[in-house]
Every structure is written in C-alpha cells, then in structure tokens.
C-alpha cells in the first residue's frame, strides 16, 4: 500500500520547487495541490497554523513545513535513491550552511526586486548581487555546489533561476551576462528530469509578476 503524500504548493514558488525536485529525485509518488495564495485553503491553514504559507508536505496526515526541512525529511525517508545530503558529516554540515545562507540572504531582497520600486528596489538589487557573487565564488569550477553530485545546495537555489528573467526585466538587473558560471550550473541542473519538471517557464513567471505589479501594486 502506497504512503499518502500530499504537497500544498504554488506553481511559481521557488521554495515549493525544492520539495518537488526532492520528491522527483526520490521517484516518490505524491498528490500535488495548487494553492490560491489570496484565498488559502482550510487544509493549508490547518496544516501550517503558525506561518500559514506554502509549501506544506503532508505525509500520512502529518505536516512538515519549511522547504529545506522538507527536502531533508524526504532524503531521510528514502536514503537509497539519489542521496541529497552527503554521507560525510563535515560535507553535510557545509551543505546545510549554504542552504541556510540562501534562505536567510535571498528572501527579503528577492521579494523587494519585484514588489518595490525606487530606492527600496535599488537597495534590493545591491543586496541580491552580493549574494550572487558569494554563491558564484562558492560554486567556482565545480559541476554542482557539492562537487560532482547534485545535492541540497543545488536544490535550495535552482528554483531562483526561473525568476532570473523577471528580476532582469522588472529591476533592470544583469544576471545572465554577469554570472556565466551560475548560468552554466543552472543549465546542468536543468538536464535533470526532476529540475526540468519542477521549474516553470520564465516567461510565465514574468507575466504573472508583471500583472501583479500593474493590477495590485500599480507598478509598471
């Protein structure tokens, strides 16, 4: 009998993409439920009463919240298929450090890039570029962030790639030209079926964000 696994998510969420990628890497069957973020479902509010946000992974009726925690949970449940965390304790700690860095350093500036204008957007641009420089340096000449194996840090960051065009268009950023190593890394990740299935089309993301800025925020 198959385990019941439900993912409450939103198609454009780079955080939900992490969980989708992890599930696909492990070849785990699950039920995907799209959430309307302007009218959150009773199930979402019940399963994540503290933060009331996606993604929420529901395993046999039990909720697991926060995407990086979900990815590690999935890796622990199915350790034999495409391991996400390295077996070496130090390397595992390093992977967790960089995943945490991505979470702590990207959320505020990335949201401001598309939801703000003027000085706030300019400040967000500077902050995000510094993050990209740091990650570019950490990647170096490695195939993936952890070396030759696709892992936690790759999963933590690759979802942002689907938003890069949006950041470039709405915030006048130059990411593709300025960070060729990160772009090459993203293309390598996209060759994996799990990533290709999880990441939405960048044009779709741009249109959604542009519509939101114009209609809801009144920003061109």
UniProtKB/Swiss-Prot annotation:
Its EC number is 2.5.1.18. It catalyses: RX + glutathione = an S-substituted glutathione + a halide anion + H(+). GO terms for cellular component: cytoplasm; cytosol; mitochondrion. Pfam families: GST_C, GST_N. Residues 3-82 form the GST N-terminal domain. It is found in: Cytoplasm, Cytosol. GO terms for molecular function: glutathione transferase activity. Glutathione binds at residues 13-14, 39-40, 53-54, 66-67. Keywords: Cytoplasm, Detoxification, Transferase. GO terms for biological process: glutathione metabolic process; toxin catabolic process. It is an enzyme of class 2 (transferase). Residues 88-208 form the GST C-terminal domain. Belongs to the GST superfamily. Tau family. PANTHER family: GLUTATHIONE S-TRANSFERASE U23 (PTHR11260:SF605), GLUTATHIONE S-TRANSFERASE, GST, SUPERFAMILY, GST DOMAIN CONTAINING (PTHR11260). May be involved in the conjugation of reduced glutathione to a wide number of exogenous and endogenous hydrophobic electrophiles and have a detoxification role against certain herbicides. This is Glutathione S-transferase U23. It comes from Arabidopsis thaliana (Mouse-ear cress). The gene is GSTU23.
